[in-house]
């Protein structure tokens, strides 16, 4: 898999930029808190990082079809590096920092959408493509675990602005890797009209195709429900008599299980079996969450979350199914929309379950999220998986 030079470049660039993104979130959160001493404003940094995915995915999704992939990916990395560099300038007011964060967030769905669209050209659709997607997800999950640790180490030795400088450099390195590691490809056919109008038209066409719509909704709503215990990690740690910092251990549970699930599903299961376990695996994601009604201790809770993460094996089958189901002329749009939608709905899930946790005990909210997830997985299950040849 990593023997393919182009995929190797995309993979390495993804590692570098993902680590940089996580470190930036930690550093900017600390910087905002240092300026304001407001926990609410510091928390808004994380929330604001998800919102642009909806706007960028909807209004800029046509970039995956209209523009040369390498040029877009490199431009996105360099623009992100420049914007983060602006955050380092002393005296930038809080509204300016948040505006810069929002602008970076608008770039992210374009980058991910174009990367998703070019991946089937680098890795032909089939087992190699599914494995490549699984490796990308593993990077994203591992970055959450490793990146927070790296962010903490950087903040221990550098100021928040110093950590942001390191992050800007990571995006610049990612851009260089892509510039010299990817082949130049022409963009799609020239279209009249604005990028936003073209993107919205593509969005309507994708959602008008019922099988594709069901796949997208499944891929968005299931993760939005799974994140409930992560959204309530700190309150749950306090609920079971642990210090709030124990939330860090809870946050490691799902990513550990998810990485294991991607390895197992992509390496050990056939394409046909990957698709057959989509719904059972999704249901496995929610079964352990019901046990939170009994207030399991810290070690057991982390174990339950790791088991829930194993249920993410459903994603391997869904990757191939989306490629086969989306109409050929809409495949790039569907792939771009899938990635942007997952990020946005996970952010919305964080907000929703966090608000619910203000009104209800955490031991009620997590099982409630599990119930909602079971309903989503059951009602939106793929009805006619594409035949494999």
Give the positions of each predicted feature.
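Alpha-helical transmembrane-bundle signature of multi-pass membrane transport and export proteins
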Residues: 1-389
């Amino acid at each position: 898999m990593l023997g393919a030079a182009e995929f190797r470049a995309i993979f390495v660039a993804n590692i570098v930029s993902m680590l940089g993104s996580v470190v930036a979130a930690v550093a900017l959160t600390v910087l905002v808190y240092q300026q304001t001493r407001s926990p609410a404003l510091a928390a808004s940094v994380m929330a604001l990082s998800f919102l642009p995915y909806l706007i960028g995915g909807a209004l800029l999704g046509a970039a995956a079809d209209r523009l040369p992939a390498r040029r877009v990916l490199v431009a996105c990395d360099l623009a992100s590096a420049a914007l983060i560099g602006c955050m380092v300038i002393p005296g930038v007011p809080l509204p300016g920092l948040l505006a810069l964060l929002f602008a970076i967030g608008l770039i992210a769905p374009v980058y991910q959408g174009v990367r998703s669209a070019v991946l089937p050209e680098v890795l032909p659709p089939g087992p190699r493509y599914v494995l490549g997607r699984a490796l990308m997800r593993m990077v994203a999950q591992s970055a959450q675990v490793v990146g927070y640790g790296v962010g903490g180490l950087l903040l221990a030795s550098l100021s928040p602005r110093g950590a942001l400088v390191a992050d800007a450099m990571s995006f610049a390195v990612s851009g260089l890797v892509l510039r010299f590691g990817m082949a130049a490809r022409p963009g799609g056919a020239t279209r009249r009209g604005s990028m936003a109008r073209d993107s919205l038209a593509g969005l309507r066409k994708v959602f008008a195709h019922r099988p594709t719509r069901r796949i997208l909704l499944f891929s968005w709503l299931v993760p939005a429900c799974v994140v409930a215990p992560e959204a309530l990690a700190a309150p749950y740690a306090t609920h079971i008599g642990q210090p709030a910092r124990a939330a860090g251990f809870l946050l490691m549970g799902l990513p550990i299980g998810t990485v294991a699930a991607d390895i197992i599903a992509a390496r050990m299961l056939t394409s046909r079996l990957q698709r057959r376990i989509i719904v059972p695996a999704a249901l496995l994601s929610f079964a352990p969450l019901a046990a939170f009604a009994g207030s399991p201790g810290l070690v057991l809770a982390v174990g339950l979350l790791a088991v829930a993460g194993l249920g993410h094996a459903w994603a391997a089958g869904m990757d191939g199914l989306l490629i086969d189901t989306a109409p050929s002329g809409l495949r790039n749009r569907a792939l771009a929309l899938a990635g942007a939608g997952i990020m946005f709905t996970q952010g919305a899930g964080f907000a929703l379950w966090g608000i619910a946790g203000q009104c209800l005990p955490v031991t009620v909210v997590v099982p409630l999220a599990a119930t909602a997830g079971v309903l989503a997985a059951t009602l939106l299950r793929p009805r006619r998986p594409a035949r494999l040849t």
